Each structure stands twice: as structure tokens, then as C-alpha cells.
């Protein structure tokens, strides 16, 4: 089991997830991910639950969203939670987290420990500063290779997650790769090309290892990046639009979901469902891989004082008092200009009820330190 969290991987950067752009001619900056997506299960509409790197780990690895504030910065960060690593450790998995920054950076080692990882591999364990940039840590390509090689020393079953870093501001790549990737229109674009290449080489290395065929890979982003070129990516929806990709080398899990939404907090329950986990667990998210969940799944996040609820092709904005602010059909109205709140009162009311119920349960669980199974 492997989860790859890619720094600043906005959905806009992936050509195969943006076939509507440039009259269908948009290529994006991730040729490897485009090829992988054609053999994966992914979503037309998938979202982050936050806008910061520190929001991502609790969301992706423990199904705990950061609404309205980053969970790890709240008084509830000391609550008892049971992340994916904890659940898999109960089944005998060796669980390791990888991040190429200096150990302690952004508190990732502490969050990894809280969510159940037994082992942490950072810049210290990598132990070769010649492969580090001057800003964040070890370049993605050698660090992902290091992860694959380290995993090859593990006894199965194991679970690993990695948080990449090269595509973070100031958007620098190794000198030997300068000029090898499309510079596009934004400074980040060649960084995304570099990280995409690093992912390709990771999968090439992993594919030669005995554990590869038995491993489910999940690829997502920590959050979007402000460097986007298209107006739909600058909306309050676009600010959260990221990929959520499930890749099973055996080919048993393939498809492109165009209606059902997915979000970061859905990753843990989806993985546990796919692995036929047979113990009770608590998650704020849903199993996004379940075909019968079309009318139950929705996504949620928080931006500039408004909650945002996504279901099917609609996005509902809710005020801080949990009253509906505006409703949009983001398939037909990608720039979110035509408010449908009054013309579609039934949908507005249903989605508002979903949002209120979720927020009430979320707040009660946090206040009561009740974030595990009873």
C-alpha cells in the first residue's frame, strides 16, 4: 500500500483531467501521470479539504478535514485519532512515512507519529546533502528512488506514504534538468514536469520489485497552487481542485468517475474498503470507490468564511451561520457566475442539510474527543 502526496499538484496541470481546455488540445505538464491515469481509477471532480500542506496529512492519512481551521493547529490536535497507518498496523503492516525535508519540518514527523506510522524517513535518514536543494530538502527524483529501495528491504505487507517537495515555491529544479521540461506560462510548470519525471522513474524502479503487483498506489496533492493559467482554476472551486488517483497494477481497479465526487478525507475509507478491512473504523470521509454511493458522497472545504459543499455537479456555499449563500452548477457554469439558489430550492435545501449535518457531527466529535470507533 502506497500513498504519494505531491506538493502543489493542481488539477489544472494534468492534461487528461482537463480535456475541455484549449478546444480539447490542452496537454498539461504531466505526461507520466496522464499515462498512469489511463490505467487507473480516478475522478473528474476531486478536491482537497484545505489549502495548506499541514492540512493534507490529517485529511489524506486519517480522514480528518481542516474545517474551518488547520486541525493540527487547533486545541483538538491532541485528540485520539486512528489513521490509516494505525489500522493497517493492526493487521501486521510495517508503516513508514517519507519526506525529504529536514526532520521536524512543518511537524510532519509528529503528525506521522500521531496518525500511526512506526517509521519516519527524512533528510537525516537519506544522509546525502549532495542531493538536496538549498530551500526544502532532497530533490524528488533521488528521494523517490530512495523510498523504492528502502521499501524493497521491508517484509510484506507494508504501507508507505511520501510527501514530495520540489514543486514548492521558489520552484527550482536541479541544474542538470534545466531546459528539459516545458516551461509553460507559469514558474511552477517545469517543476511539475520534473516531479512527473521523478514519479515515472519511481514507478519504473518499483515495477521491477516483487511487491509491486500486490501494491495499491494512491496519488493526490496536498493542495493546489496559486500559479494557474485558466480562469476556472481561480474560482473558489478551482482553488481546491486536485487529482485523486487509485492505481492497481493488477488492473482490477480502473475507471473514470464523472459524477461522484472525491476528496482527500475519502482516501482512508476507500483504501480500507478496497483492502477488505474487517474491523470497525471511524472516518469523516466516504468510500469513493463504492458504486452505490452516488447519492451519499459529497465533498467539503472552507474558504474565506464560507463552507463549500460539492455533490454531483453542484457546489453550495454556506455562510458561517450554516445558511445557504449560493448554489452553482459547476459543469455548466465553471466560472460560478449563475447563482441557482432560488431557482433550485430543493437541491439547495438538500445540500444545505448535508453540510449542516456534517459540520455538526464534525464539531461534536472534535469537542468530545470522539474520533475513533466506540
Regions found by a protein language model. Give the residues of each.
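Solvent-exposed soluble domains appended to multi-pass membrane proteins
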Residues: 1-374
